Structures are given as C-alpha cells and as structure tokens.
C-alpha cells in the first residue's frame, strides 16, 4: 500500500493561489495517484490534514502496511522536526513532493527539514510531481519484488544428531528435515 499524505492547506488545491498551485483539486491528485498505482497492482491510502499531529498519527498507524509514502508536507516542510523523525521510523521509502519549485520562491521556503529523511524530492512540476512520485515508488517496489525470490523454508544439509559419534549413524534433526537427492557418488545435496 502506498500512503499519499498532504499537509496544511493542500485541501484548498484548485482554489488557493491557482497561479502557483494550478487548478487541479486534491481529489484530482488522489485520483491520479490511485490510477498510477493501480497499474502496478498497488492500493493507495490518501490522507490530508492541517494538523501536524494528525499526520504523524496517520503515518505511525500505517507504518506496518506502508510500502511507500508520497508526502507533500506543505509548510511543515520548513518547520517540523517531528515529521522527519517519524519518516525515519518507517520501513519504507518516502518521496517528498512540492507542486511549486520551493527553491525558486521566498528564501524561507528553500530549506526542507523533511528532505534528509526522504528517498527523493520532486519540486516544481505541478501536480504531475505526484504522478512521477507514484511511478517511481511503484517501479522501485516492482524491481525489488523481481529481485526477491519468494520466501521458502531454509534448506540444510543433513547433520549428525546430537551425541552421534563420527562415523556412526547419520540422520536429520527434525527441525532441519529437507528432501535430498543422492547422486552417483552417494553424496547428499539439497534439492
């Protein structure tokens, strides 16, 4: 599951300063991210709050099922010390997104306290930045899944039971029982 988290004032997308943030609404953004992630078979849990505490609570509550986070922290980008700490506690990557180019705006917007806790940052591409963040996270997850074989029980070579003398009877301990093939030399190899 991908978490799509938007901070203060992003509920006003489409109304607030359209010359900076455009005319797309938060519903439009959520729909776009859901469509992008659906193409990879991933679900999206969207959340927006004007409260830093509510955002922290949401991230913590979903930390076990989250596979990635797309986060536009809004003005919390420049003020929150708790948000990057929370992101570092998550076992998944975060992509920080800003609709406008925060580095080309007022000097106080240039520093992101969140960026050091994020895997990447997308700024100044309008709401398309959300699409690119979703695409990147989904591709990362797909690549990881392709590299990671399904978990199978560990296979162990036969071992002598506890207390067996060298050259004595050889068996498998019950917890380590695995199927084996005997080759022409009589050696055992795991299947």
PLM region spans:
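Glycine- and acidic-residue-enriched helix-capping/strand-helix junction motifs
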Residues: 13-27
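Extreme N-terminal starter segment of soluble prokaryotic enzymes
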Residues: 1-2
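A charged, well-structured terminal subsegment
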Residues: 123-161, 171-172, 176-191
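Short acidic active-site motifs
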Residues: 54-58, 79
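Short beta->alpha junction loops
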Residues: 43-53
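Short acidic/histidine-rich motifs immediately flanking catalytic phosphotransfer sites
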Residues: 62-69
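Flexible, gly/pro- and Lys/Arg-enriched active-site loops
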Residues: 76, 81-136
């Amino acid at each position: 599951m991908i978490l799509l988290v938007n901070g203060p004032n992003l509920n006003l997308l489409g109304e607030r300063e359209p010359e900076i943030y455009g005319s797309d609404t938060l519903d439009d953004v959520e729909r776009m991210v859901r469509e992008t992630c659906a193409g990879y078979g991933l679900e999206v849990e969207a959340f927006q709050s004007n409260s830093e505490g509510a955002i922290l609570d949401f991230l913590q509550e979903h930390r076990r099922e989250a596979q990635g986070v797309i986060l536009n922290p809004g003005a919390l980008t420049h003020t929150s010390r708790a948000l990057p700490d929370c992101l570092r506690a998550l076992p998944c990557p975060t992509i920080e997104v800003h609709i406008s180019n925060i580095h080309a705006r007022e000097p106080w917007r240039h520093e992101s306290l969140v960026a050091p806790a994020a895997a990447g940052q997308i700024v100044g591409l309008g709401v398309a930045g959300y699409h690119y963040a979703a695409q990147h996270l989904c591709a990362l997850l797909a690549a990881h899944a392709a590299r990671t074989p399904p978990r199978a029980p560990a296979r162990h070579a036969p071992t002598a039971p506890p207390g067996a003398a060298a050259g004595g009877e050889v068996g498998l301990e019950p917890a380590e029982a695995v199927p084996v093939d005997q080759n022409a030399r009589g050696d055992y190899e795991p299947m």
